[in-house]
């Protein structure tokens, strides 16, 4: 049984009439120009892609949507499609399991992916999965109500990881690491059960930058969150389609969409988290130097192993000269006495006798410090 077949049999989502009409007419509306959503041309043909996307989405867009909202949505749509294309995140026939926590990031991810699914030149399925970790006070009815209202196929996976985290993490320590590992393990196993070929997480560009600095400052490593990751057992593929998206745009998008946000009462209530400190630092940088974060993120995509000091990443031990000894002018390692004339004969510059120059001297005639021109000295060969 293929992943797509398994997915179809296990989900029975409800759709409104507008969604059905849009899906029925999808292939009729798809043109060659729409394929530029995943085109790898340098200019990305954004205007053409947006024109076609606007035509497809026109029949379902609300007249009350402001131009400001549509502009922001278009920006996110572009950035997510670029990330999908650049890292080959989603392929034809994929079943994408979107992990929805109830936070702004995962809501935005799900919303944009559903939007792209309707205009993409390839076919892929989306299923939303929420992991109910049994945190005290967790409003377990919020997400199912929202997903049902939107007609989105979904699962609610119930696992009491909260009690485990509380029991194994010492008092005063952060829960994030243990919680993340337990959550990841649960989602990995469930993805295989439903035949999902990709697991989409809602981490954005600023999450990746914060993780980079956390590892740099506290872990002694140059590493972050990759946009695409194969699990250690090679059984699951993680993707982060929001890799190019800034958090401030997600905050604004979630506000305009009025997503029913569910706060994290497990780690969100802890104080003095190192990640929170790093996030504050990044926000201060962004306010004072608007291009700094973009430059740092660009650097993460432009690594020069030979310019660092990781012996596992670059083979420094076997570095050797590739010089032709026949090109040497003289025998021995250094120019010997009596060979200066030979240098002059072949036109190479010859250094004058050693000169001692001290710029901090006083002009005795004027009794004041007078700058003197530094004499030109030919380079020593």
Swiss-Prot record:
Cofactor(s) this protein cannot do without: Mg(2+); [4Fe-4S] cluster
GO MF term list: 4 iron, 4 sulfur cluster binding; ATP binding; magnesium ion binding; sulfurtransferase activity; tRNA binding
Reactions catalysed, as given in the entry: cytidine(32) in tRNA + S-sulfanyl-L-cysteinyl-[cysteine desulfurase] + AH2 + ATP = 2-thiocytidine(32) in tRNA + L-cysteinyl-[cysteine desulfurase] + A + AMP + diphosphate + H(+)
Motif segment (PP-loop motif): 101-106
Pathway: tRNA modification
One GO CC annotation: cytoplasm
Binding residues annotated for [4Fe-4S] cluster, in chain numbering: 176, 179, 267
Cofactor note: Binds 1 [4Fe-4S] cluster per subunit. The cluster is chelated by three Cys residues, the fourth Fe has a free coordination site that may bind a sulfur atom transferred from the persulfide of IscS.
Keyword line: 4Fe-4S, ATP-binding, Cytoplasm, Iron, Iron-sulfur, Magnesium, Metal-binding, Nucleotide-binding, RNA-binding, Transferase, tRNA processing, tRNA-binding
Pfam families assigned to the protein according to its UniProt record, in alphabetical order: ATP_bind_3
GO biological process per UniProt: tRNA thio-modification
Stated role: Catalyzes the ATP-dependent 2-thiolation of cytidine in position 32 of tRNA, to form 2-thiocytidine (s(2)C32). The sulfur atoms are provided by the cysteine/cysteine desulfurase (IscS) system.
Subunit details: Homodimer.
NCBIfam families from the UniProt entry: PRK10696.1
Family stated for the protein in its record: Belongs to the TtcA family.
UniProt miscellaneous comment: The thiolation reaction likely consists of two steps: a first activation step by ATP to form an adenylated intermediate of the target base of tRNA, and a second nucleophilic substitution step of the sulfur (S) atom supplied by the hydrosulfide attached to the Fe-S cluster.
This protein's name: tRNA-cytidine(32) 2-sulfurtransferase
Organism the protein comes from: Psychrobacter arcticus (strain DSM 17307 / VKM B-2377 / 273-4)
